[in-house]
Regions:
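Bacterial N-terminal signal peptides that target proteins for export
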Residues: 2-17
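Formylglycine-dependent sulfatase
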Residues: 14, 22-25, 30-427, 431-434, ...
């Protein structure tokens, strides 16, 4: 049924052979064949998903399948993407490099044309004997690493070139899409179905697989079956304490900290409290729809007897404002809600399942961590270490900061987080800076950057930013 629209080259894949199993250990009950091969990998990505999940402590939202996955994973409670936008974030994740090194600072740049010699995560696994299989959104739409996949690769992107930017139509930005039935007609349902087909086809093989399943929701317009909307009473949908009808810079913060125009929802107009609740309800429904698809894929993984030899990673590609500071998008946000994402890793025999890791981590750690877990040769060029030690001991000491950037109006924004502090600046501080004590001010409402008593903290945070390569530099 139609949805209801409501306003409101293989050459590069050749080469390196198989290697021995590394850190990963299968369960004693696993068969001889499963024990002999390297672990499988299942990647599950969601678009525009912030830590709006039951397992992350959000009361009222219904995410039973992802919550169940969390109970068999290490959940990273302070995981930060390296850019608050789809293309740059995914390019960073899939190369293990900062956005300033990839040169992808927006949704119109193609990673492949900038660094054709780099092995992305799926390409590296393919070169090392994995059947790499894609369904849904893994790289940014239209910018796939075509040759990295045995199956599922998109046609080579746009003649290997960048493309012109596009702007969202303000008249359609507030649309909410209601699906009938279970949403079988939607691309995300179909992506889950194809992932299940991959598991059935490749799960019996001696060749290990890497299945990458990417969901397009809850990206705008929020879309879900009617029954998902029915899970939530709009009158009980909570709004943030710093809600405002339009993007609003908090007192004492730089103007650039909150872009004046929303990029996804309520573009060019104010949001009433009622409209805000309706939109957040739709976002929650879309998250529940994604959760149902995760449940389908995980059920198949278990039914096929693959769970004990498969590393599962769940990740959201960046955060999202749902009214915080009057903002309804991710664009340009260096705030907690713009950069913090769900990040879970289940590695049977390695991960301390069911535990939460309180350490600050960078999401681009995924690539070196999977290489580590699967016993593949370490790859040069990665700009963050494997977080395997935190899978074994989630509370172990970890002093690596998390660095993120944004880029707008030819100005680079930089953010760095440590256990206690969050510092951000624009144009290296010439366009403003902010310092937040995240222990005392988790909502990020007070800017301490100008406090003379904290000058040493500011200096220390700026020293951390030296880890960030200059724009266009090569590792």
């Amino acid at each position: 049924m139609k949805p209801t629209l409501l306003p409101c080259s293989l050459l590069r894949a050749a080469g390196l052979g198989a290697v021995a199993v590394g850190l990963f250990a299968t369960s004693p009950s696993a068969g001889a064949a499963a024990s002999a091969k390297r672990p499988n990998v299942l990647l599950i990505f969601a678009d525009d998903l912030r830590t709006e999940l039951g397992c992350y402590g959000v009361a009222g939202i219904k995410t039973p399948s992802i919550d169940a996955l969390a109970r068999r994973s290490v959940r990273f409670d302070r995981a930060y993407v390296q850019f608050p936008l789809c293309n740059p974030s995914r390019a960073s994740l899939l190369t293990g490099r900062y956005p300033t090194a990839t040169g992808v600072l927006g949704n119109t740049e193609f990673l492949g044309s900038r660094h054709p010699d780099w092995d992305t995560l799926p390409m590296y696994f393919r070169k090392h004997g994995y059947a790499t299989l894609r369904t849904g959104k893994i790289f940014h739409g239209g910018y796939d690493d075509t040759d990295a996949w045995v199956e599922g690769g998109e046609p080579r992107p746009l003649g290997n070139a960048d493309r012109k930017g596009s702007s969202q139509d303000p008249k359609r930005s507030d649309s909410i899409v209601v699906l009938e039935g279970d949403g079988e007609s939607h691309a995300d349902y179909k992506s889950a179905t194809r992932a299940i087909e991959y598991l059935r086809k490749y799960g019996r093989s001696e060749q290990p697989f890497l299945v990458a399943c990417g969901f397009s929701k809850p990206h705008s317009p929020p879309t879900a079956p009617r029954k998902m909307f029915d899970l939530y009473d709009v009158e009980k949908i909570p709004l943030p304490a710093d809600f405002a009808p339009h993007p609003t810079v908090p007192k004492g913060f730089p103007e650039r900290s909150v872009p004046a125009r929303n990029g996804d929802l309520f573009i060019g107009r104010e949001a009433s409290i009622r409209e805000a609740r309706e939109m957040k309800r739709a976002y929650w429904a879309a998250v529940s729809f994604v959760d149902a698809q995760v449940g389908r894929v995980m059920a198949a993984l278990g039914e096929l007897g693959l769970r004990d030899n498969t590393i599962v990673v769940f990740w959201g590609d960046h955060g999202y404002h749902l009214g915080e500071k009057g903002k309804w998008s991710k664009h340009g946000s260096l705030w907690q809600v713009g950069l913090a994402v769900p990040y879970m890793i289940s590695a049977p025999g390695v991960s301390a399942d069911g535990q939460a890791c309180p350490r600050v981590v960078e999401c681009m750690s995924m690539y070196p961590t999977l290489v580590d877990l699967c016993g593949l040769p370490a790859i040069s060029g990665h700009q963050t270490p494997s977080i395997t030690p935190l899978l074994r001991q989630p509370a172990a000491p970890w002093d690596r900061p998390a660095i993120s950037v944004s880029y707008s109006q030819r100005t680079l924004g930089r953010s760095v987080r440590t256990e206690r502090w969050h510092y951000a600046d624009w144009d290296e501080g010439r366009a403003g800076a902010m310092l937040i004590d995240t222990e005392k001010d988790p909502a990020e409402l007070r800017n301490l950057a100008a406090d003379p008593n904290l000058a040493a903290v500011v200096s220390e945070m700026r020293r951390h930013l030296r880890l960030l390569p200059a724009v266009g530099s090569r590792p």
